[in-house]
């Protein structure tokens, strides 16, 4: 990211770029304005989405027994994971009731206990007979579970969804004659931090009182009072229509008020008056619109299905106005991590929203802005006037307090609280990505710049010159490695990106900031990233010498793209560091392999990226594409979708790279309306191992440099078919001016390919996700 004052001017004007102006592969001066051709239009049939989504449906012909095997439904707030009732696998099916806003409110016990998300409870669907079989399908296109449960007394035909825009779970059951007396039973959970099952709680901590279940004029409700005040409420009604019954369930949470009961009862009363199909219609329409914002088809059937399931999962777990996803999204299960985690998880959870063109799910930008006052309270009192931070784990309002302190982010050079300082700057990189992919200046002006300024200011309090004349950081903590180190790479890399971004942002916003000289000084004088013969170290005092799942010591490579291998020495350093990182076994986890895949994609190594993702699939991803360690964690499969994005398109450094890291087996590939930095929508088709065409639509009129990957002379045309002037850049890229709302189409010279968007054929068959029959 350049900080030159003339950078935007240089990118926007051909006269200063030094490349020859071209039309149709010839100098513009030698070519008259090309005659208008037929308008060029990229077309996509709705069947394209239907085909890939139907193909990606998860199926179950065997009973799922855990959260990482069964179907899941959600809308960013309300969720339900579905599987056999433990200990009664042939007698009942569990429908969990989960909600991302339901948490405790006792900060004196810290975020992991006193502010933990709380289990709510579950329904059991209890047939008359013994369950002997099932046939379920989670239809991605409609976000709806359908199928049958077979017993020795008959069948239960079910349909279920969590409404996309209403706070209701609806489950319709059509029983055969022998199963007419099936029943629903609600089982409230203990309202206590799930972490208590793994770690001894602080002294004085106890669970909340039991829930109170009562009938409210035909609507049942389980009211869970909270010791801190407030309540969460599960309300439900089992409504009979004709031969079927529909269960309507809603959850509400309030603190410190006790208004949740009225809200939950009202939701159920309103929704239960609506027949299932009528209630489902707007829900299905929402999902159809959601998917059609982008398209990706690749010839590996297993990976293509996995990708579309991650989009389904993300839209089930996230909304802009919902809490930032906790470690398990809305689907809370027993876990030692019942909060939102900020030293990797939250960042990875939201990466895929950018390329897939789903910024409507960006809760990170909204939450950091809305709760910025709590970010000030996260640092020690003497720094709150000009600094911000975010602790490792927080509740939905970004609050955490470490026992014995009134703040959660440690002080560099001090051991307690743990000086894990870089988390907010890393989270703000997600905000920067949202700005860059939309070019929405309000994000830059109102959120990124003011928050990043104070996040970096926290570092500036502690930088000190050494005997070498460089600026050094006192000891800080690199997530999860163990031990504090001076000049920790996690922090130096984020500090460097932050200062560079602040300088560029100030220029774009026209701000003459008094701190700009200090930011420039940091870039000029900060200590070099500590390295040894094996590559990047954890910090100056700690080599990378044991198995470690995090890539926090490699952030300058990915995702910051501060180091990209643009020189042979830099490339060798990245390759050496990557190889050394993954060479230690024992503590590696799933996101180790997504990080390794994305770093490989940066280096253009598509085969390596595919190999790392293959290891992830074979060793870590579960039957329903969920992922587990000591408890459920959602970030790794979602970040694997981002690794696929990184293989298909990269747009760091003001260059759009089309198909930069595809493995040889992916000879056919289609991408449509893929969002890139600069607010471009990319559509491109690869056939028989070569790129046939590239189309870019500009939403902001930003400068456009694209490495299109088409061999030989090219034609560049606008939407009307008129040839456009362009300039040759470096490494096979061209520079072309696209006005806001305009588009360009790039093809081989004289080639007029079919511009339809349709799925590619698979190289080989693959089993569906879920639990199909063996």
Tell me the role of every PLM-derived stretch:
Residues 9-31:
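N-terminal export signals
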Residues 454-505:
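Acidic/histidine-rich catalytic neighborhood
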Residues 180-189, 697-711:
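Surface-exposed beta-strand/loop patches in extracellular or lumenal glycoproteins
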């Amino acid at each position: 990211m350049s900080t030159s004052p003339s950078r935007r001017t240089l990118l926007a004007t051909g006269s200063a770029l030094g490349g020859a102006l071209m039309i149709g592969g010839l100098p513009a001066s030698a070519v008259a304005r090309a005659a208008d051709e037929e308008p060029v239009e990229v077309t996509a049939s709705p069947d394209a989405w239907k085909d890939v989504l139907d193909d990606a449906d998860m199926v179950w012909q065997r009973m799922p027994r855990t959260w990482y095997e069964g179907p899941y439904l959600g809308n960013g707030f309300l969720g339900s994971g579905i599987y056999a009732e433990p200990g009664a696998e042939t007698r009942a099916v569990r429908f969990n009731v989960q909600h991302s806003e339901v948490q405790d409110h006792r900060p004196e016990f810290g975020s992991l206990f006193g502010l933990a998300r709380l289990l709510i409870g579950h329904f059991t669907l209890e047939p008359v007979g013994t369950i002997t079989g099932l046939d379920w399908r989670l239809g991605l296109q409609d976000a709806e579970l359908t199928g049958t449960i077979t017993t020795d007394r008959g069948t239960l035909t079910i349909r279920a969804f969590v409404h996309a825009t209403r706070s209701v779970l609806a489950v319709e059951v059509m029983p055969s004659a022998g199963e007419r007396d099936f029943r629903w039973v609600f089982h409230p959970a203990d309202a206590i931090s799930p972490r208590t099952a793994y770690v001894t709680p602080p002294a004085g901590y106890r669970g909340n009182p039991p829930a109170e279940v009562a009938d409210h004029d035909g609507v049942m409700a389980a009211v869970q009072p909270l010791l801190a005040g407030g309540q969460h409420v599960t309300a439900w009604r089992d409504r009979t229509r004709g031969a079927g019954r529909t269960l309507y369930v809603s959850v509400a949470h309030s603190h410190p008020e006790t208004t949740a009961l009225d809200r939950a009862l009202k939701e159920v009363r309103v929704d239960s008056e609506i027949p299932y199909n009528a209630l489902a219609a707007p829900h299905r329409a929402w999902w159809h619109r959601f998917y059609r914002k982008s398209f990706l088809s690749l010839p590996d059937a297993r990976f293509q299905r996995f990708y579309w399931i991650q989009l389904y999962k993300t839209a089930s777990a996230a909304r802009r106005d919902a809490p930032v996803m906790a470690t398990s999204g809305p689907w809370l299960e027993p876990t030692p991590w019942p909060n939102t985690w900020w030293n990797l998880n939250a960042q990875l959870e939201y990466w895929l929203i950018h390329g897939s063109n789903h910024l409507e799910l960006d809760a990170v930008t909204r939450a950091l802005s809305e709760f910025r006052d709590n970010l000030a309270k996260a640092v020690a009192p003497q720094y709150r006037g000009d600094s911000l931070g975010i602790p490792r784990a927080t509740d939905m309002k970004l609050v955490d307090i470490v026992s014995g302190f009134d703040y959660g982010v440690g002080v560099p050079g001090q051991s307690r609280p743990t000086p894990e300082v870089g988390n907010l700057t890393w989270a703000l990189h997600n905000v920067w990505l949202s700005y860059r992919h939309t070019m929405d200046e309000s994000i830059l002006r109102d959120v990124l710049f003011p928050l990043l300024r104070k996040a970096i200011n926290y570092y500036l309090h502690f930088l000190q010159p050494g005997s070498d004349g460089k600026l050094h950081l006192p000891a800080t903590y690199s997530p999860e490695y163990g031990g504090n180190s001076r000049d920790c790479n996690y922090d130096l890399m984020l500090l460097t990106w932050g200062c560079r971004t602040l300088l560029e942002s100030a220029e774009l916003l026209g701000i003459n900031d008094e701190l700009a000289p200090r930011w420039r000084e940091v870039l000029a004088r900060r200590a070099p990233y500590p390295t040894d013969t094996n590559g990047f170290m954890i910090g100056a005092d700690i080599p990378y010498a044991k198995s470690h799942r995090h890539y926090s010591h490699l952030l300058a490579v990915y995702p910051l793209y501060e180091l990209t291998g643009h020189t042979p020495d830099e490339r060798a350093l990245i390759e050496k560091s990557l190889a050394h990182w993954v060479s230690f076994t024992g503590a590696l986890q799933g996101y180790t392999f997504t990080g390794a895949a994305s770093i490989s994609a940066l280096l253009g190594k598509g085969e390596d990226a595919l190999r790392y993702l293959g290891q992830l699939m074979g060793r870590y991803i579960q039957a329903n594409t969920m992922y587990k360690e000591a408890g459920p964690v959602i970030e790794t499969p979602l970040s694997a979708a981002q690794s696929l994005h990184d293989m298909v398109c990269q747009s760091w450094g003001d260059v759009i790279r089309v198909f930069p890291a595809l493995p040889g087996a992916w000879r056919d590939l289609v991408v449509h309306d893929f969002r890139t930095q600069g607010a471009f929508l990319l559509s491109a088709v690869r056939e028989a191992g070569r790129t046939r065409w590239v189309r870019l639509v500009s939403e902001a009129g930003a400068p456009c440099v694209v490495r299109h990957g088409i061999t030989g002379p090219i034609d560049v045309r606008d939407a009307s078919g008129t040839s456009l002037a362009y300039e040759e850049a470096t490494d096979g890229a061209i520079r072309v001016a696209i006005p806001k709302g305009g588009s360009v189409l790039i093809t081989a010279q004289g080639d007029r390919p079919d511009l339809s968007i349709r799925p590619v054929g698979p190289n080989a068959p693959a089993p569906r996700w879920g639990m199909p029959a063996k």
